[in-house]
Amino acid sequence: MPRKGPVPKREVLPDPVYNSVKVAKLINKVMWDGKKSLAQKICYGAFDIIREKTGRDPLEVFEEALNNVMPVLEVRPRRVGGATYQVPMEVRPERRLSLGIRWIVEYARQRSGKSMMEKLAAEIIDAANNTGGSVKKKEDTHRMAEANKAFAHYRW
């Protein structure tokens, strides 16, 4: 932990095409080795594929996918008298967004074959339809929180 007080939050500027902070965060999450222009090509290409496949505004589909993936509850470890309990807690809004984007990109990367554009587009469409790996991850997280509800009184 920092000794000089809280670390200030970095301001993420909205992306140039959709003027959305969420899309900018998606681009930053897709980016590897600082290659932002390549990450932008991948994300905007994926959004074009989404427009072709669904016939809807890709930003709407992405927002819907994020809402289906963002977790409300998660478990956090808490040591009490030599035992570690998984304590269910609510997820802060900033963390919800970052987890949602992280899971979408992570499960898009795990898909087999094809280019990253197609994999990302497929994962976003699946998440918008409440299917896919990222939605399953959210459900697993919620299931863990539900299973450990007995330890909810250990919240801090």
Curated annotation (Swiss-Prot):
What keywords sit in the KW lines?
Ribonucleoprotein, Ribosomal protein, RNA-binding, rRNA-binding, tRNA-binding
Cellular component, GO annotation: small ribosomal subunit
Question: Do you know which CDD domains this protein is assigned to?
Answer: uS7_Bacteria
Pfam families in alphabetical order: Ribosomal_S7
Q: Name one GO biological process term.
A: translation
Statement: the UniProt record of this protein carries the keyword Cytoplasm: no
Q: Which residues cross the membrane?
A: none
Q: Name one GO molecular function term.
A: structural constituent of ribosome
State what this protein does. Answer: One of the primary rRNA binding proteins, it binds directly to 16S rRNA where it nucleates assembly of the head domain of the 30S subunit. Is located at the subunit interface close to the decoding center, probably blocks exit of the E-site tRNA.
Q: How does it assemble?
A: Part of the 30S ribosomal subunit. Contacts proteins S9 and S11.
Q: Which family does it belong to?
A: Belongs to the universal ribosomal protein uS7 family.
Tell me the protein's name: Small ribosomal subunit protein uS7
